[in-house]
């Protein structure tokens, strides 16, 4: 079975990898990595459909749940944990589940990816509902933990999606929308942390970013819902206000304070020259979309 997967096959360009110079190794890795973005581009239609599903979940109060084992699980967690500071959402809104739990983030947990019962328990522990979207991630497209999770999600009526790096992936059968990015053989045979992992990260970036834009977390190309939890982010928040309104730093700082540290509110207050209360009301009526609040 494994030998049929392109991610497990040997790469003809690197048959003598151990004899290459460091420069040659880096060159071939770079050349192979350049093929990843092209492979992802061929799946944009499916990624778009999946994003629309995620947006629909968010709009009805649902969540985005990533599931994976090993590198795939870690990438899901990586994308999930960046959403609160970047888009100002609750940490529960986007979550990453990895076979074997948090220990598996830094250590291999033997047998975890083959444990189908564990997937169901993990989803039950977060109270999965029909409003949620579950996206299973597996380079091979056949990880039992992920398949079991998708199967359970479908049973309770949740939306399901999958990301694999082989065509005709097993997990695609359990997904409402499947993304199959064919990255081909790795330079190091079977090491799917390389091209396959890069492809998965690119797709996850697209899904979370486009979905958040779809629910009003971005104005122009600015992170207007950024959570300023430290000095650097507070300075970034003020710069965002400056970029969005063309005011100087002192004015941005003054409105940032007046808006109680809420970038969106400060922007609306400046551009419409209105009170904090009016800006807040406009944003609420516009479901958080700054552009709509300004109309």
UniProtKB/Swiss-Prot annotation:
It is an enzyme of class 4 (lyase). One of its GO terms (molecular function) is carbon-oxygen lyase activity. It holds the Pfam family GKRP_SIS_N. PANTHER family: GLUCOKINASE REGULATORY PROTEIN (PTHR10088:SF4). A lyase-type mechanism (elimination/hydration) is suggested for the cleavage of the lactyl ether bond of MurNAc 6-phosphate, with the formation of an alpha,beta-unsaturated aldehyde intermediate with (E)-stereochemistry, followed by the syn addition of water to give product. Belongs to the GCKR-like family. MurNAc-6-P etherase subfamily. Homodimer. This is N-acetylmuramic acid 6-phosphate etherase.
């Amino acid at each position: 079975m494994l030998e049929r997967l392109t991610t497990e096959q040997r790469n003809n360009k690197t048959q003598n990898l151990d004899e290459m110079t460091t420069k040659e190794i880096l060159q071939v890795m770079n050349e192979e990595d350049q093929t990843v973005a092209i492979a992802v581009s061929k799946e944009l239609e499916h990624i778009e459909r999946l994003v629309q599903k995620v947006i629909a979940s968010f709009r009805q109060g649902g969540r985005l749940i990533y599931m994976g084992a090993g590198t795939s699980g870690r990438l899901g967690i990586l994308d999930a944990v960046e959403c609160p500071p970047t888009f100002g959402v609750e940490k529960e809104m986007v979550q990453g589940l990895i076979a074997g739990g948090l220990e598996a983030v830094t250590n291999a947990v033997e047998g975890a990816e083959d444990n189908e019962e564990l997937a169901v328990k993990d989803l039950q522990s977060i109270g999965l509902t029909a409003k949620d979207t579950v996206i299973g991630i597996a380079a091979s497209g056949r990880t039992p933990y992920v398949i079991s999770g998708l199967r359970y999600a479908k049973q309770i009526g949740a939306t399901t999606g999958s990301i694999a790096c082989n065509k005709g992936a097993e997990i695609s059968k359990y997904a409402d929308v499947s993304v199959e990015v064919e990255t081909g053989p790795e330079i190091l045979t079977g090491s799917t942390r390389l091209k396959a992992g890069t492809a998965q990260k690119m797709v996850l970036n697209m899904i979370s970013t486009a979905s958040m834009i779809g629910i009003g977390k971005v104005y122009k190309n600015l992170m207007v819902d950024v959570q300023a939890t430290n000095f650097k982010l507070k300075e970034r928040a003020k710069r965002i206000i400056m970029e969005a309104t063309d005011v100087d730093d002192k004015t941005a700082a003054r409105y940032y304070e007046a808006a109680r540290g809420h970038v969106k509110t400060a922007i609306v207050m400046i551009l419409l020259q209105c009170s904090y209360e009016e800006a807040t009301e406009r944003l609420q009526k516009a479901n958080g979309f700054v552009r709509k609040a300004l109309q």
